[in-house]
Every structure is written in structure tokens, then in C-alpha cells.
Amino acid sequence: MSFFDSYRKKMQMPSKEEVLPGRVQPIPTAAAHFVSGHPLKGPWPDGMKQVLFGMGCFWGAERLFWQVPGVYVTAVGYAGGITPNPTYEETCTGLTGHAEVVLVVYDPKVVTLNELLALFWEEHDPTQGMRQGNDIGTTYRSVIYTFNAVDRAVAEKSRDAYSQALASRGLGPVTTQITDAPDFYYAEDYHQQYLAKNPDGYCGLRGTGVSCPIPLAH
């Protein structure tokens, strides 16, 4: 396979015939968040809400959100594909269909979904399709996965507002996928809160420089 064929393959979602089989057993992780000590997989306090964000390499994206007041816990993992309980190595092949994502569990009384969405839009480039900077492939696509219809509508409205802001600067179109949350598979323990364990580690986040105009209240 030539370089160009390999590149083109990485930019395409795999067919059902190509998808790796995965496994029944979940990938093991620590029980608690390395930074906050809160339960990584629950149970979480009553009233917490969830959202999944994919914005390139999940290391930097997770750190972005765990630092936000009102965010109870974060975790990195894989979602949006077909392979059950994939490994990192499998996901990197592009043959699972999954994107690298961050699970954000938050208290809506302290931080709104719109505030989280503003960070999402401003801190990566949502116009790059199946890549994010030098990270190339379907694994790094921009996604928002929501857990109810109301939150999905909020996310879609924010996308429309940010699309207009980008267009006014000659940028776009937005390629971010917004859907109902699919199955979320936790990534390996060494990926969880990676930049807290490795402060000098890689962080590929880079925004467009365009501010998000959405109102920060619900």
C-alpha cells in the first residue's frame, strides 16, 4: 500500500467487514480519578450530568475539563465505533471506528453545558474532519455525544453559533459530529489523567483563535 493509499485509508471509517472483533471483558482501570479521587466509573452524586467530547488526542482534552469548577470527574475512552472494549493499539489502527473521547461528569448547578461547549469549541479546531493537527485519522475526529434530546439540541445550537463565528473570519465549515451517546469504553489505566501523571507529556490541543459567541447560561 502506497503512502497516499495508507493516508486515505486512515481518513475513512472502516466497513463492518474490516472492523476488529474486540472482546467481552472491559479494559481494567483504576477505581478512582488520579486527581480528584472521585469514582471513575460511579456511582456519582445525584444530579450529575454527562457529556462525551472528542477533540483530538484525549490526554489534553481530559486535562482541560478536569480543571473546570463543577466538573466532578473525567475519564478518557473510546466511542462512536463498533469494536467492543477496544485497546488503544486497536483504536489507533482505525479499524474499530471509535474516536478518542473524554467523559465529563458535571454538576449543572455549578457549570452549564454551554460553558463546557464553549471550551470545546474554542480549544480545538472543529473544521479539520478526520484529524486534529498532526494527529491524523478517524480516531481524532471532532464529536459531541449527548445523553438526552435537550442536551443534543443545546449542542447543535452551539455548533450553529460557532459556525457563524468561524464563517465571519473566513473559516469553516464545522465537521463536528453531534449524536446521541453511543457505548463508551474506558481506555487503559495509563491513559487516565495522563497529563497529571506525566506533566510534560504531549498535548495537541490548538484552537482556531475564534471566540465562541454562545450564551453561557442554560
UniProtKB/Swiss-Prot annotation:
Question: Do you know which InterPro entries this protein is assigned to?
Answer: Met_Sox_Rdtase_MsrA_dom (IPR002569), Met_Sox_Rdtase_MsrA_sf (IPR036509), MsrA_MetSO_reductase (IPR050162)
Q: Looking at the keywords, is Protein biosynthesis present?
A: no
EC no.? 1.8.4.11
Query: From what superkingdom does this record's organism come?
Result: Bacteria
Q: Which UniProt keywords apply?
A: Oxidoreductase
A molecular-function term among this protein's GO annotations: peptide-methionine (S)-S-oxide reductase activity
Q: Where is the active site?
A: C57
Q: What SUPFAM superfamilies is this protein classified in? A: Peptide methionine sulfoxide reductase
Q: What class of enzyme is it?
A: oxidoreductase
Of the GO CC terms on this record, one is: cytoplasm
The record's catalysed reaction(s) read:
L-methionyl-[protein] + [thioredoxin]-disulfide + H2O = L-methionyl-(S)-S-oxide-[protein] + [thioredoxin]-dithiol; [thioredoxin]-disulfide + L-methionine + H2O = L-methionine (S)-S-oxide + [thioredoxin]-dithiol
Q: Does the keyword tRNA-binding apply?
A: no
Biological process according to GO? cellular response to oxidative stress; protein modification process
Q: Which family does it belong to?
A: Belongs to the MsrA Met sulfoxide reductase family.
The record, for HAMAP family, names: MsrA
Q: What does this protein do?
A: Has an important function as a repair enzyme for proteins that have been inactivated by oxidation. Catalyzes the reversible oxidation-reduction of methionine sulfoxide in proteins to methionine.
What is the protein named?
A: Peptide methionine sulfoxide reductase MsrA
Q: Which organism is it from?
A: Brucella melitensis biotype 1 (strain ATCC 23456 / CCUG 17765 / NCTC 10094 / 16M)
